[in-house]
């Protein structure tokens, strides 16, 4: 006699980079084992790979996880975590209110701040992907040339981090991998897929410092997973607006 089958609930969500709703299910014991194995190794690459594998499993193989922009992957992971474990995550935040003057400080290490650790409850289903108003992926670098960028994926970032230790080389590699096309004033379009990685890196290396700063504006204003709340310190009563931004902010 066969054992009964447990019905797993299904949900849908909308990602910025995909027009159709994405189906997903909570992760199960077999996926939890993947996380635990990666956690035991302590290797960030293993942890990242485990997240990607679990997301692939829980979206029924219907979307290309490796092609998702990093912010969409983070949002999907947070929503999946909310349905699988608990919709509420508790994050500790240290109060930054200055409660002691310079004369009142006890020693040179005393910052004068309250410093009390406060638990903050974050409902994962209230997290949003925020796109800054000024954000654009079309960057004119001069009067004659415009670059169209595509968002970095987690897979790309992992490959770059694995191979590059030098900051300048890292920047060049990331920028070159995120170019989608280069457009000239006369309308000529050079698709990045038609160029070699070496050609794209050489193109980045010919940019001036001012042009690189324009390009970096694309990355500095990229969409992020965000949660806004009001912080109230249980120790000193200080209040301030507080924003959690990026995957790391949602976990201690």
Task: Label each region the model flagged.
Residues 1-252:
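Long C-terminal interaction/binding lobes of large macromolecular proteins
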């Amino acid at each position: 006699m066969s054992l009964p089958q447990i019905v797993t609930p299904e949900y849908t969500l909308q990602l910025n980079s995909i027009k159709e709703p994405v189906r997903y299910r909570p992760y199960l014991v077999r996926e939890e084992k993947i996380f635990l194995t990666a956690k035991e190794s302590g290797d960030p690459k293993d942890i990242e790979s485990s997240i990607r594998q679990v997301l692939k499993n829980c979206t029924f193989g219907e979307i290309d996880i490796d092609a998702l922009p990093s912010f969409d992957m983070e949002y999907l992971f947070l929503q999946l975590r909310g349905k699988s474990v608990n919709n509420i995550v508790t994050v500790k935040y240290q109060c930054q209110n200055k409660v002691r003057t310079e004369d009142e400080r006890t020693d040179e290490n005393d910052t004068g701040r309250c410093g009390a650790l406060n638990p903050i409850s974050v409902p994962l289903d209230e997290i949003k992907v925020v796109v800054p108003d000024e954000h654009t992926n079309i960057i004119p670098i001069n009067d004659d040339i415009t670059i169209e960028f595509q968002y970095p994926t987690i897979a790309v970032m992992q490959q770059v981090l694995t191979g590059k230790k030098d900051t300048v080389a890292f920047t060049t590699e990331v920028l070159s991998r995120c170019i989608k096309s280069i457009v000239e004033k006369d309308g000529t379009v050079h698709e990045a897929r038609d160029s070699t990685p070496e050609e794209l890196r050489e193109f980045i290396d010919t940019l001036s410092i001012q042009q690189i700063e324009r390009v970096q504006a694309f990355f500095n204003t990229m969409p992020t997973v965000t949660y806004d709340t009001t912080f109230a310190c249980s120790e000193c009563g200080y209040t301030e607006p507080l924003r959690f931004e990026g995957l790391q902010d949602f976990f201690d």
